[in-house]
From Swiss-Prot:
Domain of life: Eukaryota
Biased composition (Acidic residues): 73-90
Region (Necessary for binding to the m3G-cap structure): 211-333
Function text: Functions as an U snRNP-specific nuclear import adapter. Involved in the trimethylguanosine (m3G)-cap-dependent nuclear import of U snRNPs. Binds specifically to the terminal m3G-cap U snRNAs.
Transmembrane segments: none
InterPro entries: Importin-a_IBB, Snurportin-1, Snurportin-1_N, Snurportin1_C
Site (Interaction with m3G-cap structure): 107, 146, 279
Major place of residence: nucleus
Name of the protein described by the UniProt record: Snurportin-1
Source organism: Gallus gallus
GO CC, any one term: nucleoplasm
C-alpha cells in the first residue's frame, strides 16, 4: 500500500501543467510557468511508466469500498486542499480522513494535439455537473467530492448499493461520475471497480466497453425508484476522426453539454491529473484541432470567451499594483480572473449577475 499511495501522490503532482483551472494556453496571452517537457513527451513517459508498474489495486479498491484503513498511516483531515472549490455544506460528522481525496482521474487542457488522435483517442461528451466518486458497498451507496468529503449516502441498484442486492461483502462498485443536481442523475464517466473486480490497470477502451455492457445488465439503474432515488446513466464515447467530431458537435444531447474529454485508448485509470486525458470546450475544437465544423449551438463562442483576455490583463494589473510583481502566479490569476475555473458552474448569460461574477466550469475535469 505504501507504494500505491506514493504513486497516487505522484499522479496528483501532475496537476500544475495545463490545468483547466486556468485559461487554455493557446487561447490566451497569459503565460503560466509553462510545461517544460511538453505535453506529448509527458504522455509518452506515462504510457511507458504504466506498462512497467503494477500496483495493488485489488487491496486499494477493497479499502475504498469497506472503509478499512487498518494498518495504514492515517492522513487525518486537518485542513482543506486550499483551492476553495468545495463550497458545499458538509456535516462535520460526515467528514472522513483524506483517504477518499484525490481518487479521480482528472484532465489537462488539450494543448499539444496528438499525432495519433484519430487512431488512439476517444472522446466523451460531458454534461454540466459536479464530479463525484461513487462507492456502492455493504448495502449503501456513498458519493464523495474530489476532496474526499461524503456529501450523500443513499440506496441504489448498483451492485452492493442496497440491502437487497448485497449477498456478500465482496460485491461493491467504485465509479467516476458527474452529478447533475437538476436532473437528479449520476452520469457514469468511468469505472474503477465493478462487483469487486478492479479495472484500474485496464485500458480505457476496455473499461468503457465493459462498463457499457455491465450497465445494460442492471435493470432499473437508469430510472428513479424507492431503492434507486438517483438515476445512473452511462455516457457514450465516440471516435476522434474528423467526421465523428463534426457529427458529435451537431448532435442534440439529452443534457446540457459542458465539454469534451479526450482519452488515450491505452490509459489506465490513474488518480490525479494526467496529460493522457484532455479537456476542451466545444467551441474550442475548431481553433485547437484545426477542424472546420458546422455552426451549431455547441460551437458558438460564449460571451465570456471574448472577455477572458481582458480579465487576465486586469488581474495582472491589479497584482502589479498590490504586490509590485511583474506577473501573478497561475493560482492567483485563477482566483482573481473569474474565467473558466475548474470547479464552478458553466457561466450564466452575460446579463446574469452570477454569470458576471463566475465564468467557469462546474465539472472537475
Amino acid at each position: 500500500m505504501e507504494e500505491l499511495c506514493a504513486a497516487l501522490a505522484g499522479g496528483v503532482a501532475l496537476a500544475a501543467p495545463n490545468s483547466p483551472a486556468a485559461p487554455h494556453p493557446r487561447l490566451s496571452a497569459y503565460k503560466g510557468r509553462g510545461d517544460r517537457l511538453g505535453q506529448a513527451e509527458r504522455r509518452r513517459r506515462l504510457l511507458c511508466l504504466q506498462r512497467e508498474r503494477r500496483l495493488d489495486y485489488v487491496n486499494h479498491a477493497r479499502r475504498l469500498a469497506e472503509g478499512d484503513w487498518a494498518g495504514v498511516e492515517s492522513d487525518e483531515d486537518g485542513g482543506e486542499d486550499g483551492d476553495g472549490e468545495e463550497e458545499m455544506e458538509v456535516d462535520a460528522g460526515r467528514r472522513l480522513p483524506k483517504r477518499y481525496a484525490n481518487q479521480l482521474m482528472l484532465s489537462e487542457w488539450l494543448v499539444d494535439v496528438p499525432v495519433d488522435l484519430e487512431q488512439e483517442w476517444i472522446v466523451v461528451v460531458c454534461p454540466v455537473g459536479k464530479r463525484a466518486l461513487v462507492v456502492a458497498s455493504r448495502g449503501s451507496t456513498a458519493a464523495y467530492t474530489k476532496s474526499g468529503f461524503c456529501v450523500n449516502r443513499f440506496p441504489s441498484l448498483l451492485p452492493g448499493g442496497n440491502r437487497h442486492n448485497t449477498m456478500n461483502e465482496k460485491v461493491y462498485c467504485i465509479l467516476d461520475c458527474i452529478y447533475n443536481e437538476a436532473e437528479q442523475t449520476y452520469y457514469i464517466l468511468d469505472v474503477m471497480c465493478w462487483r469487486g473486480h478492479p479495472v484500474y490497470d485496464c485500458q480505457t477502451d476496455f473499461r468503457f466497453f465493459w462498463l457499457s455492457s455491465k450497465i445494460q445488465e442492471e435493470e432499473g439503474l437508469g430510472e428513479k425508484s424507492r431503492i434507486n432515488p438517483y438515476k445512473f446513466v452511462g455516457l457514450q464515447n465516440f471516435p476522434c476522426t474528423s467526421e465523428s467530431l463534426c457529427e458529435v458537435l451537431t448532435t442534440n444531447f439529452p443534457f446540457e453539454v459542458d465539454g469534451l474529454l479526450f482519452y488515450h485508448k491505452q490509459t489506465h485509470y490513474t488518480p490525479g491529473s494526467t496529460p493522457l486525458v484532455g479537456w476542451l470546450r466545444p467551441y474550442m475544437v475548431p481553433d485547437i484541432l484545426g477542424l472546420t465544423v458546422p455552426a451549431t449551438p455547441l460551437t458558438a463562442k460564449p460571451d465570456y470567451a471574448g472577455r477572458q483576455l481582458q480579465q487576465i490583463i486586469e488581474s495582472k494589473r491589479s497584482k502589479k499594483l498590490a504586490a509590485g510583481k511583474a506577473q501573478p502566479s497561475a493560482e492567483a490569476a485563477a482566483r482573481n480572473g473569474h474565467y473558466e475555473l475548474e470547479h464552478l458552474s458553466t457561466p450564466q448569460p452575460a446579463n446574469s449577475a452570477q454569470g458576471q461574477e463566475e465564468a467557469g466550469s462546474q465539472m472537475e475535469n
